[in-house]
Amino acid sequence: MTLAEFRRTYPAATFTVSSGKLFTYRYYQNPQAKATLVLLTGGIGLSDLFYKHFARFAGDFSVLTFDYQLQFGDNGEFADAVAELLRHLKEKVWLVGQSLGGVVAQVIASRHPEVVEGLVLSNTCSLSGNMSKAGYQDLMKIIESQRKFKKWLAFLPFPLIKRMMRWAVMKKKTDGFTPQEKAAMEELCGAMMELLTKPYEQHMIDFLCDAEHYFGMTRNDFAPWEGRVLLILSEDDTTFTPACREDLIALMPSPTVVTDLTGGHLALMVRLEQYADLVTKFILERTP
């Protein structure tokens, strides 16, 4: 399935939240499914980059996805809008978040536990109020690097910025990949080059940096999902440090932890079938 075919098969819809703002999403209601997944993309913020995951999961689940839209200025406002949409759709969901999506999942779950069945978080960090000194310092380095990157956006041509982003992904993430795995990453980068705009990239940097305002979460915030949290933390992920990973494990109640899904920070893209099998098995085992 191509991206164009995906968009025709799963057209976008809109919902007006109580603030009057429009929320755009893609939703497939599988009549045979007993669980619904919300796919929360990483820091690029383009949910269509997960179109193969959407199509793969649609065989077993109902699936919902969306971008981190410009009209929602911070994580809290966005989480509240997501909860409104879920109540409108009459859905209680598994939040499946990658990287920044894992952070967004924590904000949604802590603010609106009534719409959440469980969490699947991959190659991400915690919003713990009790994170280690090393973990906190490592996260703040990521946030500060994003603030510096936003300054580049002010004076560098955006086509050059996108080429730099593509080069960084292909250079850093594909060492040792098979030709098929490199092709998957090339496809991802091609879609990113097509879809990403300068205003949205600026918004995504602000959205990521805003996450520091939600530090302070405790294990009690996630107590409703004891035994219903899957953490996929690739050993070869160099974006989040071991300290960040340990802080996340410590925050979650009795999580299942998988570390051997290799492929770096974007392992779920290059190991799609292995990733999908892990997630599907975990959720179906916990679905009556």
Annotate each language-model stretch with its function.
Residues 21-72:
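Conserved HGGG/HGGXW glycine-rich cap/lid loop of the alpha/beta-hydrolase fold
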Residues 52, 64-96:
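Active-site loop/oxyanion-hole signature of alpha/beta-hydrolase fold enzymes
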Residues 97-101, 105:
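Gly/Ala-rich beta-loop-alpha elbow adjacent to hydrolase catalytic centers
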Residues 119-152:
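Flexible "cap/lid" loop of the alpha/beta hydrolase fold
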Residues 155-209, 215-222:
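Conserved alpha/beta-hydrolase catalytic His-Asp/Glu region
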Residues 225, 231-233:
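Short beta-strand/loop motif that positions the catalytic acidic residue
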Residues 238-244:
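Conserved alpha/beta-hydrolase "acid-adjacent" motif
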Residues 239, 263-276:
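Catalytic histidine-centered segment of alpha/beta-hydrolase-like enzymes
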